[in-house]
Amino acid sequence: MFNRKKTSFHRIQVYIFLLSAALSSTFLFSGCSKQDDYPKTRDIDYTVVTGSEIPQELRKMIRERKENAFELSFSCEGELYIVKGYGKQLSPDFSITVNELYLSDNYIVFDTELYGPKQKSTSKAKSYPYIVVKTEYINKSIVFK
């Protein structure tokens, strides 16, 4: 004969498993949709600046922060400098690309990406990759992606 307690316990286990699977798949697939919280109003023209083109005060701020990843902005003489640093890397030859710099209704959106060396480096040199872009001064908060 069947043991009723054992059978009902087994049914509860099956229901819990099915409920867990349904909830897990719901959370998993809901994370796949991309929601654009910052719809583009217009692109912003910019110039990547290096070395002496970067204001001295901003260069000092970068040196102070370069060990760790950082994001900052700096305005000077009607121009806005936006900086994204990736912190200390254990090899040289990293590159950074600007995917987008645009204006949304309430924000400036700055999207960059760090690319590692194409081949494994034998150099022991460390690097501190960062990128500085210069654009017109716009009085809006910056969202870094």
Question: Which positions does each model-derived feature cover?
Answer:
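N-terminal Lys/Arg-rich, disordered targeting/topogenic segments
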Residues: 1-9
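Exposed, flexible binding/inhibitory loops of compact, secreted disulfide-stabilized domains
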Residues: 2, 13-15, 28-145
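Composition-driven detection of intrinsically disordered, low-complexity segments
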Residues: 10-11, 18
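Bacterial N-terminal signal peptides
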Residues: 17-27
